[in-house]
Structure formats: structure tokens, C-alpha cells
């Protein structure tokens, strides 16, 4: 997190050139770390640049473990669209314009990209902006886009509230022929957006291009943190990933070297034969060796085989990677043989704890974005929305065991101890139905005389199908 004192902002609430150079310098110092994390995610780990002596096998095997960790953690957190709900008709009327704007800018894709970036880099950044409505240039709506963390950051006040002061996004500018031409910067404050040009990120001179107003009521750049340390999900196991890559690469190198064993001759020598062939040519072409007497011996020099030890170490490393990252190995044979709902939850317990922390920080960003959209909607004349009363729900992307839910509902129905609402919830537990969806289904069942009783519905549905 980059922090500065609010009192050093200018009268417009924007950073001075000196402050801007200072925060850019602090951001640039963190770029090697971000680049390293990106390389691991893309599979470009250090093993790919390993150099060995000439003539030795140099297999370089990089495993996409970082991508696996990010994919599982991101899918579990943001695999399902985020839901927004509020009580009251008037409140819902204030929320509807915002959810409509969310739909137009594919908010679920933005959320997924933010979750992925936070999982890789420890933080994600998005930019809320105004977009012209297609087909009507006189109408605008708010939209949002995810920015690369290597090129964007938010600066916070140095008080205990961590209030955003301004955000910075930059790109490398180019000339007409594509050659580099410095950088363009957009500095977003609470009221203004300032566009600048700078020769390089450490240059002393900053040239202002334009200053425009925005209508979001606060800094229109939102950061999503992965945790309080802004660390990526695989950052703590990088040394284990390196060890795993090295072990597997060396195993392949050893196998390759076995083909080039040294031949040990005892009690005899090999010389050029009558055809002028060197000893190595004789062995390669004839595939045979004639020894002069029974005292002579020939054997290959074998290195000590450590395949069993290597396999034990390999298993220990991969187990430690999953344990320390808290992302389970879903291909574990012990787990694959037991896929009941209870077993699944035990297997995912560590991931659930990790995701709970990730979700708390992600929610902060979602609510900050919602406040920006709510302010913009109010400026456009829509009803005022109390953002604090909006219920934001993130649903886990769990594999569903519909058979268990159906069996549970059948048991409850046979005992006569559960209401229609309870049994509907049981049938659709795997579908993550909301309260409104459950209530609508109950009313449909109870209000339709042609509907069969619950027991008939359960039997007709079959294991794991539920009510359509």
C-alpha cells in the first residue's frame, strides 16, 4: 500500500508533481516483484533459464502449479456471479438502475478478472468511468474495467481510515511508427481526472495535457486486496515450486544420462581393427564385444539409483505446496474415492478459510464500487441508494452432490417433519436458490391444485434432479 499525507494535495485535491514523482518511484520499486509473480503464473519460473556445463543434459521442466493455485482459488471465490439485494420496493427501485449498468459492462467478467489479479499479485485495480450508450450519444452510463496491477495503483491517506486520495494509471505512449514515446498518465482524484505526459517514470518534468471533472463523488479507482499483506495466493510456496521444478528436471536429466554410460574394461584393451574402425565405432556398429579370455570383464558404470527417494521427495513437495497454499489437490486418489458432501467439505476446509479472508477484502472493493455507481445514478436523477443496506452475496462454486440433497428431502418428507419450504430448500440446495426463489416455488406448489404432492414430486424427480 502506498500512503501519503492528505495535506500535501493541492487546492484541487490532486497530487503535486513532487508527490506524483514520489509515488511513481515507490510503485516502480515493486515492479520486479510483480513481474516475478506474473512469470510464475505464466510458467516462466527460474528453471527455464538454468544453464549447465556443455555436454550435460539440460532439461528444464516448469510446472504450472502457480496457475493451478490461482485457478482453483479464483474459481472458488468468484466462480458464481455476485448477487445484490435490498429490502423494500423503494430501495429496490434505487438499486435496479445500478444492476442494469452492471449488466451492460459485464460485471461478472470484471469481478473474475479482479479476483484472478488479486490471487496472482496480491491486489487488483479497477477503473470506473463513463460510457456513451450505444445508439444514443446523448446518454451515458457508468462502466468499469479491470486494470493491470503493474500499471495502476491507488494512494491512501496516512491516517487510520486508509481513505483513498487518488489513483494512477499509466501506459507507454508510442509514436506513429510504434517506437516508444514516453508515458501517458491518468491521475484520478475525488473530483477531477488529470491527464499528463512524462518522458519516463523517473523524469523530473510532468506535462499536463487535460483536466476533466467526473461524477462519482470519490476516487473512481478501486483496489481489491487479497489479504492485509497484499500477497498472492502462491507467493508463500514459490521456493517449494522451485524445488519441485528442479527435482523433476534433474530426474529427466538423470534418465537421459543413463543412455551415455561409461564402459569399464578389465583385463583387456580395445584397439583399431583391421577395417580402421575406432573402438567406439566397433561397439556402435557391431553391438558386440569379444573379450580375449575369461579373466577379462566388461561392465557399465552405473550411478546410484535414487528413484524411490526421488518419488518420496516429489510426493512430499507437492503435498507441502497444497498444504501451505491451502489449495487442495483435487486429483488426490484418496479423495477421488470419497466424493460425499461431507468428504468434499473436509477436503475444502483449508480453502474455505483462505477464501473467507479473501472474500472479506474483496467485499470492501465491491462496496466501494457500489458507492461510486450509486453516486453517479443519483446525479443522473435516480433515487438515492443507501449502499450500507445492500446485501452483497458471493456464492461458493462448489461441486454439487444432488443425490444427497434429494435423499435428504425424501427422508424428511417420509417422516412428515418438514414443511414444503424446507423440502424445496433441500432439493435446490445445490442450485444456491435465494429466499425469493424458494418462496416463489413454494407458492407455485401450494397455489396450483393440479400440482402433485411433495412425495410424488420427489419420486418423479429421481436422485439429484429436484423440481424443475
Task: Give the location of each predicted region.
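Short secondary-structure junctions and interdomain/linker hinges
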Residues: 12, 16, 31, 44, ...
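Residues in well-ordered beta-strands of folded domains
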Residues: 127, 146, 169, 265, ...
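Extended, regular secondary-structure scaffolds
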Residues: 112-120, 125-230
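Extended, charged amphipathic alpha-helical segments
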Residues: 205-343
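Extended, helix-rich architectural segments
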Residues: 1-144, 455, 461-468
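Short amphipathic alpha-helical segments
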Residues: 90-94, 103-106, 110, 118, ...
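A short, surface-exposed helix-loop junction/capping segment
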Residues: 95-98, 297-299, 348
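C-terminal helix-loop subdomains that flank or include functional centers
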Residues: 277-278, 282-293, 309, 316-468
Amino acid at each position: 500500500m502506498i500512503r501519503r499525507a492528505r495535506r500535501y494535495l493541492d487546492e484541487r485535491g490532486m497530487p503535486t508533481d513532487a508527490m506524483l514523482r514520489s509515488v511513481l518511484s515507490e510503485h516502480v520499486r515493486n515492479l520486479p516483484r510483480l513481474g516475478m509473480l506474473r512469470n510464475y503464473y505464466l510458467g516462466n519460473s527460474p528453471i527455464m533459464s538454468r544453464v549447465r556445463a556443455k555436454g550435460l543434459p539440460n532439461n528444464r521442466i516448469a510446472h504450472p502449479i502457480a496457475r493451478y493455485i490461482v485457478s482453483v482459488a479464483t474459481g472458488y471465490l468468484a466462480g458464481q456471479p455476485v448477487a445484490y439485494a435490498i429490502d423494500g420496493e423503494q430501495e429496490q427501485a434505487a438499486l435496479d438502475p445500478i444492476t442494469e449498468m452492471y449488466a451492460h459492462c459485464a460485471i461478472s467478467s470484471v469481478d473474475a478478472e479482479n479476483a484472478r489479479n488479486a490471487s496472482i499479485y496480491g491486489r487488483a485495480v479497477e477503473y470506473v468511468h463513463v460510457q456513451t450508450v450505444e445508439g444514443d450519444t446523448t446518454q451515458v452510463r457508468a462502466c468499469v474495467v479491470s486494470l493491470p496491477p503493474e500499471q495502476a495503483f491507488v494512494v491512501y491517506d496516512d491516517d487510520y481510515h486508509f481513505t483513498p486520495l487518488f489513483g494512477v494509471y499509466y501506459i507507454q505512449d508510442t509514436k506513429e511508427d510504434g517506437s516508444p514515446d514516453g508515458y501517458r498518465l491518468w491521475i484520478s482524484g475525488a473530483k477531477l481526472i488529470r491527464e499528463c505526459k512524462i518522458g519516463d517514470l523517473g523524469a523530473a518534468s510532468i506535462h499536463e495535457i487535460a483536466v476533466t471533472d467526473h461524477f462519482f463523488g470519490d476516487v473512481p479507482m478501486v483496489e481489491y486486496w487479497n489479504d492485509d499483506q497484499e500477497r498472492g495466493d502462491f507467493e508463500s510456496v514459490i521456493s517449494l515450486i522451485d524445488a519441485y521444478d528442479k527435482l523433476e528436471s534433474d530426474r529427466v536429466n538423470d534418465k537421459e544420462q543413463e543412455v551415455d554410460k561409461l564402459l569399464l574394461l578389465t583385463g583387456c584393451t580395445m584397439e583399431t581393427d583391421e577395417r580402421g574402425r575406432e573402438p567406439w565405432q566397433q561397439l556402435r556398429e557391431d553391438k558386440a564385444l569379444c573379450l580375449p579370455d575369461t579373466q577379462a570383464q566388461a561392465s557399465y558404470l552405473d550411478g546410484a539409483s535414487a528413484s524411490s527417494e526421488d518419488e518420496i521427495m516429489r510426493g512430499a513437495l507437492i503435498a507441502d505446496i497444497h498444504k501451505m497454499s491451502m489449495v487442495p489437490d483435487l486429483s488426490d486418489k484418496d479423495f477421488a474415492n470419497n466424493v460425499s458432501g461431507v468428504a468434499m467439505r473436509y477436503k475444502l476446509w483449508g480453502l474455505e478459510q483462505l477464501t473467507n479472508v479473501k472474500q472479506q477484502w474483496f467485499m470492501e472493493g465491491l462496496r466501494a464500487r457500489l458507492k461510486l455507481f450509486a453516486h453517479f445514478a443519483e446525479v443522473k436523477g435516480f433515487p438515492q441508494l443507501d449502499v450500507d443496506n445492500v446485501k452483497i452475496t458471493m456464492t461458493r462454486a462448489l461441486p454439487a452432490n444432488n443425490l444427497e440433497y434429494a435423499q435428504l428431502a425424501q427422508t424428511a418428507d417420509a417422516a412428515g417433519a418438514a414443511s414444503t419450504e424446507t423440502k424445496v430448500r433441500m432439493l435446490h440446495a445445490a442450485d444456491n436458490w435465494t429466499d425469493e426463489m424458494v418462496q416463489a416455488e413454494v407458492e407455485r406448489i401450494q397455489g396450483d391444485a393440479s400440482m402433485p404432492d411433495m412425495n410424488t414430486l420427489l419420486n418423479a424427480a429421481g436422485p439429484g434432479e429436484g423440481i424443475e
